[in-house]
Amino acid sequence: MDKFMMMPKGFMGLPMEDEFVTTAQNKKNYAIAVQDWNYGPEVPTNEPGANKKFYVGLAEAMQCDEKDARRKHCSNCEYYDNTFMTQVRIERIPLATYDKGAGFRGHCEKLNFICNDMRVCQAWEERESEMD
């Protein structure tokens, strides 16, 4: 792979006026996601059995069993957007303390905040098959 695609001359990313969640909106919407949508866990991990209290509560809220609740992540949610251009927009939002150790960042299109792929909330919906 010794050939690279050339970027169009003058491409400097997105204009600042391109509409996207602001840092202030993100902070507010994150707090709403935690309080009203059970967004978590606070310290995500891939360790089986970790964060039991969180996943038992999520399972009850989502009317599924704990095992199914653990399979749900922002990264496999219908509303998770981590496309290239969204990543460019996300770079405008500084990393928050809660972003560290929580996986990659994406944009939750339903709750309009920067979420992390290792977390989940009650708004989670199964992603539609891309084969459809």
Where are these regions (language model features)?
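Cysteine-centered metal-binding/redox modules
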Residues: 2-132
